[in-house]
From Swiss-Prot:
Residues 458-477 have a biased composition (Low complexity). This is Uncharacterized protein YKR015C. Residues 334-346 have a biased composition (Basic and acidic residues). Residues 334-382, 436-479 are annotated as: Disordered. To yeast YJL043w. It comes from Saccharomyces cerevisiae (strain ATCC 204508 / S288c) (Baker's yeast).
Length: 568
């Protein structure tokens, strides 16, 4: 990528048949008189093209011979009077860095002819070459544009460097470190330089003084062995450089090395970000583990809608404080109840024994810690198929109505938002045979007769052609009103939680009390926490209704509650 000349013959053997030259001048405040002089030359008939206030995007897209480092570009075609050096050299550049060198290397494309020349410092130039180029270019620029020497002191910026034979200009030291990339040459004396691109530690380069160790091992460059001192504007010379963008050899090794370093930096940054993310995940998991209640998956994979989430958060393997009206009903052991259920259930004696053991384990739990503590959602591993997401429903024994609800659920999941369906609520049409009603508080030796519970809702959006009883009841209801509710969610929860629509029960007691309950999704029951009002040891969920107040019916009581406290 970087080539160098090692003799005076290189300057004399440059092909002088080039017809287009590029002079790049950095636009800064003290250059107004120089620009005025150039404008005067343009008015006299000289062919100039001046580009001011150029952006990086202009450099990338422009077809002219311009470079992204510069803010003003002047294209010269016929400048034979400028001098033999400029006439034989393909171009003269006056350069100042405006961005970090490392950023420039990241953006430059070495295959583009305008990006094949980079501005770096090397120590192998002899004093003669420096003096020749600096003095000749200085003379050319002075003869072309500035009238006063003060203009030249502003324009002429050469990088200071120790280790070179020093020249004095206006009683000040300066050195011209000029780098000439390979133009079209007759000489075969070409030296490849591959360590220019290693000076990536420099950022916001204006004009700096380098010490003699600047040409050491490029990979070991740092602030210790590369002394850099920024000079003030009055003392700043520009780095002057000649190049032919289209006709010089490019050594791709530095660019490939730079690409490898860039790739390594990106990989290291990616690995570092992944490590930070994993640490954050571990911290969050530790926090959740400290408050998590160990239980089975239960309801956490249920359909996610606003109304369903409210119920899921309520009965998601957590202890809850439910405040509302509790109605106790007797448990009925009847053969007809087992026939109506599609799936086998755990015996009530086993459930009660299991719930008592769980309640004894949680005897020391205070009320403050009995609030809901939802499980962290982890549906990625289980959300594969019906068998994995709905473990408590066997699709082999799924009824036709359950299949319709499941298909409708899949349609809902594909919509943009969870839609609501019109649901006609009728007044309570439960027909109960109250042949035997006992006083509240007497829980022993209670017997009830069958209680027929008809479905209370007619879901307009679901397929209910086979359910003729629902249609008849809805037509006969005169005091029906429409509300927006998620009827499918209710039906889905009833099927998922193994709720029998025709449960056999009898209302016994109704009073206002405060219950602390814990729902166990594995056995689908709810347990009373110790130290509270008398409720039977184990209750099984029987029905869920959605209205302004969430109504939850269990096998032993039902609760209507408005407020549920959840600890995240």
């Amino acid at each position: 990528m970087f080539l160098d000349y090692s003799g005076y013959e290189a300057l004399t053997e440059i092909n002088s048949s080039f017809g287009k030259y590029v002079l790049l001048l950095q636009q800064f405040e003290g250059c107004r008189s120089l620009k005025d002089r150039l404008q005067m030359l343009k008015d006299l008939g000289r062919e100039f093209m001046i580009f001011e206030n150029l952006n990086v995007e202009d450099f990338r897209e422009s077809k002219n011979m311009i470079h992204r480092f510069y803010t003003m570009v002047i294209s010269l075609r016929q400048i034979m009077e400028i001098g033999p050096l400029v006439r034989r050299s393909p171009a003269v550049l006056v350069v100042e860095f405006d961005c970090p060198v490392e950023d420039c290397l990241d953006e430059l494309d070495p295959l583009h002819p305008l990006n094949r020349a980079f501005i770096f410092i090397h120590k192998q130039w002899t004093y003669y070459h420096q003096y020749y180029i600096v003095e000749k270019v200085k003379k050319v620029i002075l003869d072309m544009a500035p009238v006063k020497e003060d203009d030249w002191s502003i324009l002429h910026k050469v990088v200071y460097s120790e280790g070179f034979v020093e020249r004095r200009y206006k009683k000040k030291k300066y050195l011209g470190d000029i780098y000439i990339p390979q133009p079209l040459m007759k000489s075969n004396k070409i030296t490849t330089i591959s360590n220019f691109s290693q000076l990536t530690k420099i950022s916001n380069v204006r004009v700096y003084r380098f010490n003699a160790t600047a040409a050491c091992d490029p990979q070991n460059l740092n602030k210790k062995n590369l002394s850099i001192k920024e000079l003030k504007d009055k003392d700043l010379p520009n780095l002057i450089w000649t190049l032919e963008p289209e006709k010089f050899y490019v050594d791709m090794r530095p660019y490939k090395e730079h690409e490898e370093r860039k790739k390594r930096r990106e990989e290291e940054a990616k690995v570092r970000m992944q490590g930070e993310e994993q640490e954050n995940i571990m911290i969050e998991r530790k926090k959740m583990d400290s408050i998590e209640v160990e239980a089975s998956s239960g309801l956490k994979n249920i359909i996610k809608t606003p109304l369903a989430n409210r119920v899921v958060n309520t009965f998601n393997n957590c202890a809850a404080v439910v405040i509302g009206y509790v109605t106790e009903v007797d448990k009925v052991k009847d053969d007809n109840e087992e026939k109506n259920n599609d799936r086998p259930k755990i015996a009530n004696d086993g459930i009660a024994q299991k719930s008592r053991s769980e309640s004894e384990d949680n005897a020391g739990t205070p009320m403050e810690n009995a609030y809901f503590q939802p499980e962290p959602q982890d549906n990625d591993q289980n959300n594969i198929s019906w068998n994995t997401t709905m473990k408590d429903i066997d699709p082999i024994y799924m009824s036709e109505r359950c299949a319709r609800v499941w298909r409708k659920e899949q349609q809902m999941l594909g919509l943009e938002k969870a839609q609501t369906f019109e649901k006609k609520y009728c007044k309570d049409q439960m027909v109960m045979d109250e042949n035997q009603v006992e006083e509240p508080g007497k829980h022993s030796e209670r017997h009830t007769k069958n209680q027929v519970v008809r479905p209370r809702t007619k879901i307009a959006s679901s397929a209910s052609k086979n359910d003729n009883s629902n249609n008849k009841n809805s037509k006969s209801c005169k005091n029906c009103h429409k509300e927006e509710a998620h009827g499918l969610v209710r039906e889905y929860l009833k099927i998922k939680l193994n709720i029998s629509p025709h449960g056999e029960r009898n209302q016994r007691t109704k009073d206002k009390r405060k219950c602390i309950m814990k729902y166990n999704a594995s056995s689908n029951n709810i347990n009373k926490m110790p130290g509270e009002s008398e409720v039977l040891g184990s209750t099984i969920l029987t029905d869920i209704h959605f209205k302004d107040v969430v109504t939850v019916k269990f096998r032993d009581f039902k609760a209507k509650f408005r407020k549920v406290k959840i600890n995240a």
